Amino acid sequence: MSVAGGVAGAELKPTRVIDTHTHFYDPTRLGGVPWPPKESKLLYRTVLPDDWAAVAGPQGVRETVVVEASPLVEDNQWVLDLAAKDARLIGVVGNLDPNDAGFEANVKRFAANPKFRGVRWRGGLVDIDKNPENVLRGAKVLAEHGLELDLNGSNAMLPHALKLAETVPDLRMVINHLGGSGDPAATKPGWDKGVAILARRCPNVYMKVSALVEQVPGAEGAAPRELAYYLPVLEHLWKEFGEDRLIYGSNWPVSDRGAPYEVVFGLVREFFAGKGEGAMEKYFWKNALVAYGVK
């Protein structure tokens, strides 16, 4: 089946959808933004909640958890200010470095806001295999505040994610972007085994089915629109994480590198509709309530 012309496939639709991975930013702000880079013709523009709603709303997606990509501490406040004025933004995953002397104070500061639901550590900015004492201390601080931890890039890989998840078992962790599977037609060596080990040994770890179309090499916006192309990755994640630990995230607007939002949503809707109504509801919103503590 194809979603090339929009959402297709089974008529089964989720009753609610929480998109747990969007990015909002405004390069025209005083001081600009450290991400995305000016060289990115696709991404370097003002991207705000109404822009997301214009593409997500027609698919029935009306709530999101925003992931802050900027490493600047005050940019966490900027996105929280957005969320304070917009009920569609039900949660924020911040960007705070455990190697920063002010990490614990900043966690305490932002955690006072009920929409602040966690922190993301992205490989290259925060490498969890370096400065292990700071990383472990930071992870425990997050757990103590009832927050979760998103991991992206090299951090999502074994053995680092596994060690952290087992050392701090009361910390909810969400692996971003399929754990960096690579092209579904030729996944990265060791990805399938790594995913299996992490899923089986760490019940506190969730997998975000996000950045699906961006894993495909090739021209911008030209990712395959046939569900069959992505099945090697999707079926493996389903086998290992099951219906209780898979979460929906679009990674918009970065997802436009692979395909429009309607295609991104349509692919996973078709896949999870095929797993039954209960599994689909868990994937699109119920699991997000548990992982992120949103309402």
Annotated model-derived regions:
Residues 1-20, 45-63, 235-236, 240-247, ...:
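Mid-to-C-terminal alpha-helical segments outside catalytic/metal-binding sites
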Residues 59, 86-87, 114, 146, ...:
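A structural signal for short coil/turn segments at secondary-structure junctions
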